[in-house]
């Protein structure tokens, strides 16, 4: 009788163990599936990189939904910034945003220089208007600082030299999901041998040998949405309270009409 009870107890423990392991495996499969979906969602735009001539975007179709008015060819918005904290509590951030209207085949935007303090009291922000013609950035505002002027006129978006053809090789990411928004995040460890990392080190002052983290963020439907948003970040930060990263995004949305501004 005692032996039969032990057998029943043993079988119960085995069944429970299999159930727990099965649940764990199920969660792993779900996370792997979401990681793959996030990468596939990003691949729709990253497969276009490098976009050496930004004017090629005038002839590139993006994801369209009911937000687009009839006849609207849409607008590509490309963005790159470089953020660095040289002093505790202070973040210096420079970059450019450019809107390429496929209806008018014109590209306008601005270069920004921000100094952001934790207390926000002494924060500083300055925008310099730009346009693009013949794949060349043209500065529309007067800039006294010659070095800044050269940085603006010679600016290259990350998407102009980045190459993510090997995106599938980024594996075992840390995936997090907020179903309420919805939003999706995935983090992948990069290598200093990665060509994208080498490109960034050659273009920016990155005083650390630490291999960066690739962060992918999506707001909205994974399948695509004109009201959603995708952001790519390559984070070189050495510690939690320091900031050293490059942010990139390429999004397709309805073109803004004058009445909307």
Swiss-Prot record:
GO CC terms: plasma membrane
Key words, A-Z: Cell membrane, Lipoprotein, Membrane, Palmitate, Signal
Signal peptide positions on this chain: 1-22
A family per Pfam: DUF576
Lipidation feature positions (S-diacylglycerol cysteine): 23
Keyword Signal: yes
Presence of keyword Lipoprotein: yes
Membrane topology note: Lipid-anchor
InterPro entries per UniProt: Csa, Csa_sf
Main subcellular localisation: membrane
Location of this chain's protein in the cell: Cell membrane
Lipid attachment residues per UniProt (N-palmitoyl cysteine): 23
Superkingdom assignment: Bacteria
Family, per entry: Belongs to the staphylococcal tandem lipoprotein family.
Name of the protein in its database record: Uncharacterized lipoprotein SA0400
Protein species of origin: Staphylococcus aureus (strain N315)
Source species taxonomy: Bacteria, Bacillati, Bacillota, Bacilli, Bacillales
């Amino acid at each position: 009788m005692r032996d039969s009870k032990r057998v029943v107890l043993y079988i119960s423990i085995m069944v429970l163990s299999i159930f727990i392991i099965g649940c764990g495996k199920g969660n792993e499969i779900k996370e792997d599936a979401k990681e793959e979906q996030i990468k596939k969602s990003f691949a729709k735009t990253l497969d276009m990189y490098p976009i050496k001539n930004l004017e090629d975007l005038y002839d590139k179709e993006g994801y369209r939904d009911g937000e687009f008015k009839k006849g609207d060819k849409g607008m590509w918005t490309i963005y790159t910034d470089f953020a660095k904290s040289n002093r505790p509590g202070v973040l210096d951030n420079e970059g450019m945003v450019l809107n390429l209207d496929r209806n008018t085949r014109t590209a306008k935007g601005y270069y920004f220089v921000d100094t952001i303090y934790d207390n926000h009291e002494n924060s500083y922000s300055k925008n310099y208007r730009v346009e693009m013609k013949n794949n060349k950035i043209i500065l529309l505002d007067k800039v006294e600082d010659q070095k800044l002027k050269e940085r603006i006129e010679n600016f290259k978006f990350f998407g102009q030299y980045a190459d993510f053809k090997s995106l599938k090789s980024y594996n075992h990411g840390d995936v997090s999901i907020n179903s309420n928004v919805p939003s999706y995040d995935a983090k992948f460890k990069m290598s200093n041998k990665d060509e994208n990392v080498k490109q960034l080190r050659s273009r920016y002052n990155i005083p650390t040998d630490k291999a960066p983290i690739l962060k992918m963020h999506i707001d909205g439907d994974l399948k695509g949405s004109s009201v959603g948003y995708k952001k790519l970040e390559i984070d070189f930060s050495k510690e939690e309270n320091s900031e050293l990263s490059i942010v990139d995004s390429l999004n397709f949305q309805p073109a803004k009409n004058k009445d909307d501004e």
